[in-house]
Structure formats: C-alpha cells, structure tokens
Amino acid sequence: MRKILRLFPMMLLCLCVLTACSSDDGDNNGDSNGKNGVYVINGHKFVDLGLPSGLLWAECNIGASEPEEAGYSYRWGEVEADIVNEGYKFKDGNTYTKYTKKDAKTTLEPEDDAATVLWGKNCHIPTKKEFEELVKCCKWKFADEMGDATVTGPNGNHIFLPKITFGLMYRTSSFDTTYPTDECAYSLQLWRENTTVVAGTSRTVSMPVRPVAKR
C-alpha cells in the first residue's frame, strides 16, 4: 500500500508533463493546426505555400468572407477602409508627415498596419520583399489580361487574388525610397498578362490588403 502511495504522485507528475507537451505541439499556442497546409491564426485562415521564408498567406483579403471577394480597400498606412472624402492621415497640405526620407521609416509600424490592427499582432501587410518572393517562387495563372490570379506555391498549395475595378493591385507595407518625393509606397501590380511587378504607387490610392503571418 505504501509503495502505491509513493508511486501515485510520480504518475500524476508524468501525466501533467505529457499533457503539457501534447497541448503545445497540437495547437501551436492555440493559433493553428496546419492540416492540409491551412493554419488558423486569430480566427483567420492562412495557407502554407511552401515558400523559402515559410511565410503564410491569408486565404482572403481584409473585409472579404470568400477568396473571390475583393474586400475593403485602404490607403497606405491607414487602418480605416475606403476613406475617399477625408484628408490622408499622413499629409498636411502638400507635406507628408510620417514615413518620409527625413524620418527614415521604411516599413509601416504596427499601429499603421491594417492587418496587424484588424487581424492581430501575428499578422501584417506583406513587405516589398515578401511580395517579390511570392512573384518569384510561385506559378501565376490569370483569368484574363488584367484579371484575377491563382497563385500556386512550390508545394502545390494555392491562394486566389481577386482583381479590383482597375486591375490587380495590392498594398505592401514598404515605403518607396527611390521615388524623388515622399509620395509613393510599393504595391503589387499586374500591368498586363504574365507581367506582375512590385512598384511604387501613390500612398493615397486605396487598394485591398492580403495579410501574411509567420508560423
């Protein structure tokens, strides 16, 4: 009887350790499961495309409930959607007040990143470099000359990028330091079929956002 009593606390300790390890491995801090290459982070689905960086791309744009929906559009650095009749957040008259050559800020800070603010701290708007990886490492299939795109990664998983009214254009979180003024930030652009580039566009143009996240 004494031997059984001495063994019982040890059995409980082992059980607790095994349970804790199982919990951490199974739900990745409660954010994802990875089944079929799909991870759920902060309630949103992300796809593992097998990219060298390991970056996960969201299934949908911000404001969309299906991959085929364009969702909401945002001016660069703003976290409220589709503002067209109000002044740009970072402009006073003709002068840009943040993300300039003077302050040397080249990437959106978390409070100015719509993906981080709206979807949580593990998510962000893709940088120029991250979009360039998507362009370089994936196969792109377009519905038409300026149309929707199915983007298939090295591992065979894919995401769908719907176009907006004037073509396929998506925001990055990167400021365009090469432009002569502080006017531009980088965006993904489809100029014509099979020619997708990451180039500078006006910060005040509204575009959809496709969040990314790291595992």
Positions of the model-derived regions?
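C-terminal motif of bacterial Sec signal peptides marking the signal peptidase cleavage site
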Residues: 16-20
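Bacterial N-terminal signal peptides that target proteins for export
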Residues: 1-9
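Alpha-helical transmembrane segments
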Residues: 11-15
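C-terminal, surface-exposed recognition/capping segments
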Residues: 25, 29-45, 50-215
